[in-house]
Amino acid sequence: MAQLWLSCFLLPALVVSVAANVAPKFLANMTSVILPEDLPVGAQAFWLVAEDQDNDPLTYGMSGPNAYFFAVTPKTGEVKLASALDYETLYTFKVTISVSDPYIQVQREMLVIVEDRNDNAPVFQNTAFSTSINETLPVGSVVFSVLAVDKDMGSAGMVVYSIEKVIPSTGDSEHLFRILANGSIVLNGSLSYNNKSAFYQLELKACDLGGMYHNTFTIQCSLPVFLSISVVDQPDLDPQFVREFYSASVAEDAAKGTSVLTVEAVDGDKGINDPVIYSISYSTRPGWFDIGADGVIRVNGSLDREQLLEADEEVQLQVTATETHLNIYGQEAKVSIWVTVRVMDVNDHKPEFYNCSLPACTFTPEEAQVNFTGYVDEHASPRIPIDDLTMVVYDPDKGSNGTFLLSLGGPDAEAFSVSPERAVGSASVQVLVRVSALVDYERQTAMAVQVVATDSVSQNFSVAMVTIHLRDINDHRPTFPQSLYVLTVPEHSATGSVVTDSIHATDPDTGAWGQITYSLLPGNGADLFQVDPVSGTVTVRNGELLDRESQAVYYLTLQATDGGNLSSSTTLQIHLLDINDNAPVVSGSYNIFVQEEEGNVSVTIQAHDNDEPGTNNSRLLFNLLPGPYSHNFSLDPDTGLLRNLGPLDREAIDPALEGRIVLTVLVSDCGEPVLGTKVNVTITVEDINDNLPIFNQSSYNFTVKEEDPGVLVGVVKAWDADQTEANNRISFSLSGSGANYFMIRGLVLGAGWAEGYLRLPPDVSLDYETQPVFNLTVSAENPDPQGGETIVDVCVNVKDVNDNPPTLDVASLRGIRVAENGSQHGQVAVVVASDVDTSAQLEIQLVNILCTKAGVDVGSLCWGWFSVAANGSVYINQSKAIDYEACDLVTLVVRACDLATDPGFQAYSNNGSLLITIEDVNDNAPYFLPENKTFVIIPELVLPNREVASVRARDDDSGNNGVILFSILRVDFISKDGATIPFQGVFSIFTSSEADVFAGSIQPVTSLDSTLQGTYQVTVQARDRPSLGPFLEATTTLNLFTVDQSYRSRLQFSTPKEEVGANRQAINAALTQATRTTVYIVDIQDIDSAARARPHSYLDAYFVFPNGSALTLDELSVMIRNDQDSLTQLLQLGLVVLGSQESQESDLSKQLISVIIGLGVALLLVLVIMTMAFVCVRKSYNRKLQAMKAAKEARKTAAGVMPSAPAIPGTNMYNTERANPMLNLPNKDLGLEYLSPSNDLDSVSVNSLDDNSVDVDKNSQEIKEHRPPHTPPEPDPEPLSVVLLGRQAGASGQLEGPSYTNAGLDTTDL
C-alpha cells in the first residue's frame, strides 16, 4: 500500500518536471556561414552556439548528406573541417545542425556558402598544339588560337597569355610572334622558309590575374605548353645558280658539239624544288655556243680567237635559268648569270707588215704594206734609228704561236741593223745605223735594205723593202789666226773707246755654212766690253766699271760661229793702266778679346791700297784718334802695331758697354790727292769669374702645409758682381736630410741677381706625421768649374693638416653569433677605428645592411634588427624580430669617418663588414601541408604495410629543429549510423623526407574488416626533434572512407576469364566513362559450368567516387544504361548480366527459407500464447478463491491488530489510477503464484513510469529493510501469502522461512 501511494506522488511530479523543461535554441545567426574553399582540413570552421534557459548541458551535432564535410565536437560545438571544400564542385550546400539537452533535441537547417579562392591554375584545352602557315602570311595575321580555362571566379579566373620562349632562339625570332588577350597568336614579323627557319616552337604560359589563396595574394600559372609551327614554303624566290661565277676555255679549232662546261641552278624555294629550264639569253658572239636542258654549254659553230682580241679572247654568255611553273605573283621565276668562255689560240697566221704606229694600229688590210721609206743624217751615230719609218709587224696568234724573228737583207744591210730581233704578237720595227762610216752623203744619197719577219714555229715569213734617204750636214768650223791677243786700255776709259779692230776669223764652207758671226762669250769682263758681230771690232762698253784695283787684267773669249752653228774662239788679254782713285783699305775687322787683369793687347792694323804698288798712291800712314779709353793704348804709325799700356779691369768699364773698348785708327796714303780710311778697333775685355755669389739673407725659414704637392715653399735671392752672364749666372742646389722631397728652380733677374724658387715636386707631398721639420742647405754657385759657391741654411717647417683617413680595426670586425627570437639584447659588438692625425674626430657609420638566407639576398628584411652607434657599439634593436628562418646572415657594412678631415682629403675609411650569424632556435612548430586528396579504402584490396593515405609537413626551423617525426595518436571508426568505435594498432605511419618536406605514409598493420561501413578518422601528430628544449607539435585528422563488401558489384560476361582479362583495360575504360568513378577490379573468374546457363565468367569490382562514396549494383546498372556508348562497348566486350545469377537464385531460396521459418515461429508463438492464456485464466480464478478465504480468516485476527480492508483483485488498489489488475507484476517478474508462496503483488499496483513497486504491508517492509546489502530483491509475495504470514507472525511472534515456489507461475503477466 505504501508503494502505491509513493507512485501516486512521484508520477505527477515527473510529468510536471518534463512539462516545465524549456527547449534549447540556436542563436539567430546560426542560419548560414561563409567558408573559404582553401580552409585546411582539420582547421576550425565555425562554432555552433545555442542557449538553454534551464542551463542544462548541451550536446551539438550535425547531420544530412553533406555533413561529412565537418566534424563537430559534441560538448563544445566547435566545428572543424573534415573534408576539403571545393567552390568549383559545390559552392553552396545545406546541413542540419542540432542541439539537445537531456530531454529535448532541436534541429535547424544551416546554409554553407563556399567562398572562392585562387586555388586553380589556368589549364590549356586541347594541349596538342601544332599548325602550318605559309611563309607569305602577312604580318598581323592570326597564326593560331589557344584557350586556357581557369575554374576560379573574378580576377582569379581571368587568364592572361604570354609567350615564354621561341625556338629557335635568335634575335629575329624573339619578337616574331605575339599573343593577344583572347589567346590569338599573331604574326609580328615576316617569315622566310629559306632565309630564316622552317619550324618554330613556342612555349606558352597562361596566368590568372591573381587572387587570395591561403591568405596570400597568389598568381596561378599553368604548366607550359608548346605550339609547333611549320612554315610552308611558297614559290616566291627566283632560282639560284649553285656557283657565283662560271668560266671555261675551248680551242679555237674545236669541233661543233664539243662540251665546254656545265652550269647548274636550283629552285630558291627549297621546299618546292621546281625543275629549271636553261637558255642563252645573250652572247657577245651569237651562234658560237648553245646550251642543253642539262645545262651543258656546247660549241655550235666555228670559232676564231683572233676575232676576240678586243674582247680579251673571251666570249660572254648570259645564261638564264627559268623555273617550270609561275611564282606566286603569276610571273616567271628566273635568274641570269654571266659565263665567260675563253677561246684558246691555234697557230694559223704568219707575221705581216703594217704601216701604222702602236697602239693606234687596227691591223686592217688597208694598213698592210711591204714598201717603206725613211731618212737619216750622214755619218749618224750607231744605234740612231731611221726617221719617218712607221713599220709594225703583227702576228694575231698568241704566245709561242705569235712569236716571230726579224732580220735584215738587201745591198746595204751591213750598214744597218733591225730592232727588235724577236717579238711576240706585234712590235714596232726600227732600222738603226750600225756603221756610221758607211753612211756618207758624199758617197751616195740613198740606201736600201729588206726587213724579213719569220714565224718561230711554222717558219712562215714576210718581207718588206725599206728605202733610206741620206741628209747632208755642216762638217767645217771657222778659225782665228792666233789663239791669244794682248791689249791695253786706261782704267775708267770712256764708253765706246776702241780696244782693237784687227782681229778676224775664216771658214772654208760656203753659203750659209760659211757666214761668220762674232760674239763675246760670257765670262770675266764680258759685261765691260762689246764686239761688233759682223766686223769683229772690240770697244769699251762701260768705262765706269773698269777699275784696275778691282781687276787689272781681263781675259775675254772671242767666238766666231758659221751658219751651221759650228764655232771656234780666241783669247783677248786686256791690261788696265793705274790712276790714284782708291783710298786705303783696312783688311777685315778688329775685335780683340782679352781677359781682364792678365791679358795684353798686341795687334797690327792690316791695311792696303789698291793703287799700283811701289808708288805714293799705295804708301800708308797709321794714326790713333782720341777716345774715352785711348790713353790706355799706343799705335806705331808705320807698322800699325797697337798695344795696351797697363792691365785691364772688366769691372772698371761701364757695364753698359759690356766690356767693349772701341778705338778709332786713321789709315791714309801719300798720293795726290791724299785719301784716308778710318777703322774701329774693338777690344773686348773678357770677364773672369773672380767674384762669389752673395745671398741677401744669412738664413731662411719657410712653412708649408702637408699633403700639398707642387706648392711653392719659399724664395732665396743671391747676387754676383761679375759682369758677364756666364760668370754671374747663379745656379742653386739643395742638400741636407730630406732634400729629395724638394726641388729648387733658379730664375735670372739680371745684373747678377738670381732667385731660387724652392717648391715641392708635382707628385710629392709632405707628411707631417712622417717628418715635421726639414733642415736644408741651399748652395749658390757659378757654372764655371773654377768658380766658388756660397751656402745658406734653410729651415722648412711642415704644418700638420688632417689628411689621413681613419682605418678600421680588423680584429673588431670578427663575426659574431646572435640567437633569434629575443634570445639576446643590448650591445653585441664594438667596431674600433683609429686615425694618425692629431685633430681627428672619429665616428662609426653604418653604410649598408645585407640580408641573406642560404646565400640568397632577401632584401631589407633585417634592416631594423641592429644599429651601430657613433662610438662603434653594435646594438640589437628588434630582438623579437630576429628570425633565422627569414634571414640567417646579417652583414653590417660600416666605415669610420673623420669629421675634422680637411677639404680635399678622404674622410672615410675603407668599408668593413661585420658578419652577424643568426643562430636558429626551435621556434616554429611543424605544420601540415594541405592535401587536396580524398582517401578511400577498399578493405578487400588493401594489404598490410601498403600505403592507404599520406600526410606532408614542414618545419621552418633548420637542422635537428626542423626534423619531423610522425605518429598516430588516435584511430576512430565512425560507422554510418554515427557510432564511434576506437581502434588501436590498426594503422602505422612511416616518416620519410625529401628536401625540407617530410612525408608520412599511413599503412595498415593488419588486414581490415571488409564488412565495416563508415570512415576511419586517423589523428596524426607531427613533432620536431630539437637538440635542446621542448619539442613542438601539430596534429591533423584524416578521413579514410571505407567501401565495404555491400558495394561489390558483379558483371557477368559471355566470354571466358582469359578473354575478359585480356580486355580488362578496355572494360575498365568503358566503365570509367559510364560511371565517372575509379574502377577497382577485384576478381575475374569462370562461372561453374554446372551452375551457369549462359554466362561463362564474371568480374567483381568496386566503383568509387573521389569523395569516397561508391555505387551500388542498382546505381551501376542505371548509369551504364544511361550511357549508350559505354553500354554498346561493354556489350561488344561480352557483358550479359549485371549481378550474379547464382546470387539471385541463392537470394530467392534464402527468401523462401526465411518465409517458412517465419511461419513456423509464428505458429509456435500462437500455441504458446494460447497455452499461457489458459493457464493464467485458471490461476486467476484460483487466486480469487484464495483471496476470499483469506479475507474471512483475516477478520479472525488477534486483538490489537487493525483489520484492513479486504484486498480483492480488481477492487481497491487494483482500481487505483494506472493500476493493472491483470498485469500487476514488475516487468522483470514472470513468475506464477505457485512458484513463490511469498509473492503478494496482487495487493499493490505497478507504477507504469518505473520498475519500483511500493509495499503496503508493514511487516513486508520491515523484512526488506533487514535484508543484507547487495542481495537481489526477493519476488513480491502474493497477497494471500502475506496475510497468512502476518497472521502466523501475530500468533507465534516469529516468521517462518519462505517455502519454494515457482515464480514463473506466480503472475498473470503474459
UniProtKB/Swiss-Prot annotation:
<feature type="glycosylation site" description="N-linked (GlcNAc...) asparagine">
    <location>
        <position position="195"/>
    </location>
</feature>
<feature type="domain" description="Cadherin 7">
    <location>
        <begin position="696"/>
        <end position="808"/>
    </location>
</feature>
<dbReference type="GO" id="GO:0005509">
    <property type="term" value="F:calcium ion binding"/>
</dbReference>
<dbReference type="InterPro" id="IPR020894">
    <property type="entry name" value="Cadherin_CS"/>
</dbReference>
<feature type="signal peptide">
    <location>
        <begin position="1"/>
        <end position="20"/>
    </location>
</feature>
<feature type="domain" description="Cadherin 3">
    <location>
        <begin position="242"/>
        <end position="353"/>
    </location>
</feature>
<feature type="glycosylation site" description="N-linked (GlcNAc...) asparagine">
    <location>
        <position position="188"/>
    </location>
</feature>
<feature type="glycosylation site" description="N-linked (GlcNAc...) asparagine">
    <location>
        <position position="300"/>
    </location>
</feature>
<feature type="domain" description="Cadherin 2">
    <location>
        <begin position="125"/>
        <end position="241"/>
    </location>
</feature>
<feature type="glycosylation site" description="N-linked (GlcNAc...) asparagine">
    <location>
        <position position="632"/>
    </location>
</feature>
<dbReference type="GO" id="GO:0070161">
    <property type="term" value="C:anchoring junction"/>
</dbReference>
<feature type="glycosylation site" description="N-linked (GlcNAc...) asparagine">
    <location>
        <position position="355"/>
    </location>
</feature>
<feature type="glycosylation site" description="N-linked (GlcNAc...) asparagine">
    <location>
        <position position="701"/>
    </location>
</feature>
<keyword id="KW-1133">Transmembrane helix</keyword>
<feature type="glycosylation site" description="N-linked (GlcNAc...) asparagine">
    <location>
        <position position="775"/>
    </location>
</feature>
<dbReference type="GO" id="GO:0044331">
    <property type="term" value="P:cell-cell adhesion mediated by cadherin"/>
</dbReference>
<feature type="domain" description="Cadherin 1">
    <location>
        <begin position="27"/>
        <end position="124"/>
    </location>
</feature>
<comment type="function">
    <text>Intermicrovillar adhesion molecule that forms, via its extracellular domain, calcium-dependent heterophilic complexes with CDHR5 on adjacent microvilli. Thereby, controls the packing of microvilli at the apical membrane of epithelial cells. Through its cytoplasmic domain, interacts with microvillus cytoplasmic proteins to form the intermicrovillar adhesion complex/IMAC. This complex plays a central role in microvilli and epithelial brush border differentiation. May also play a role in cell-cell adhesion and contact inhibition in epithelial cells.</text>
</comment>
<dbReference type="GO" id="GO:0070062">
    <property type="term" value="C:extracellular exosome"/>
</dbReference>
<dbReference type="GO" id="GO:0031526">
    <property type="term" value="C:brush border membrane"/>
</dbReference>
<feature type="glycosylation site" description="N-linked (GlcNAc...) asparagine">
    <location>
        <position position="871"/>
    </location>
</feature>
<keyword id="KW-0325">Glycoprotein</keyword>
<feature type="glycosylation site" description="N-linked (GlcNAc...) asparagine">
    <location>
        <position position="565"/>
    </location>
</feature>
<dbReference type="GO" id="GO:0032532">
    <property type="term" value="P:regulation of microvillus length"/>
</dbReference>
<feature type="modified residue" description="Phosphoserine">
    <location>
        <position position="1248"/>
    </location>
</feature>
<feature type="topological domain" description="Cytoplasmic">
    <location>
        <begin position="1176"/>
        <end position="1310"/>
    </location>
</feature>
<keyword id="KW-0732">Signal</keyword>
<feature type="glycosylation site" description="N-linked (GlcNAc...) asparagine">
    <location>
        <position position="600"/>
    </location>
</feature>
<keyword id="KW-0812">Transmembrane</keyword>
<comment type="subunit">
    <text>Part of the IMAC/intermicrovillar adhesion complex/intermicrovillar tip-link complex composed of ANKS4B, MYO7B, USH1C, CDHR2 and CDHR5. Interacts with MAST2. Interacts (via cytoplasmic domain) with USH1C and MYO7B; required for proper localization of CDHR2 to microvilli tips and its function in brush border differentiation.</text>
</comment>
<feature type="glycosylation site" description="N-linked (GlcNAc...) asparagine">
    <location>
        <position position="616"/>
    </location>
</feature>
<dbReference type="GO" id="GO:0031528">
    <property type="term" value="C:microvillus membrane"/>
</dbReference>
<keyword id="KW-0106">Calcium</keyword>
<dbReference type="GO" id="GO:0007156">
    <property type="term" value="P:homophilic cell adhesion via plasma membrane adhesion molecules"/>
</dbReference>
<dbReference type="GO" id="GO:0005886">
    <property type="term" value="C:plasma membrane"/>
</dbReference>
<dbReference type="InterPro" id="IPR015919">
    <property type="entry name" value="Cadherin-like_sf"/>
</dbReference>
<feature type="domain" description="Cadherin 9">
    <location>
        <begin position="930"/>
        <end position="1058"/>
    </location>
</feature>
<feature type="glycosylation site" description="N-linked (GlcNAc...) asparagine">
    <location>
        <position position="460"/>
    </location>
</feature>
<feature type="region of interest" description="Mediates interaction with USH1C and MYO7B and is required for proper localization to microvilli tips and function in microvilli organization">
    <location>
        <begin position="1180"/>
        <end position="1310"/>
    </location>
</feature>
<feature type="glycosylation site" description="N-linked (GlcNAc...) asparagine">
    <location>
        <position position="134"/>
    </location>
</feature>
<feature type="region of interest" description="Disordered">
    <location>
        <begin position="1259"/>
        <end position="1310"/>
    </location>
</feature>
<feature type="domain" description="Cadherin 4">
    <location>
        <begin position="368"/>
        <end position="480"/>
    </location>
</feature>
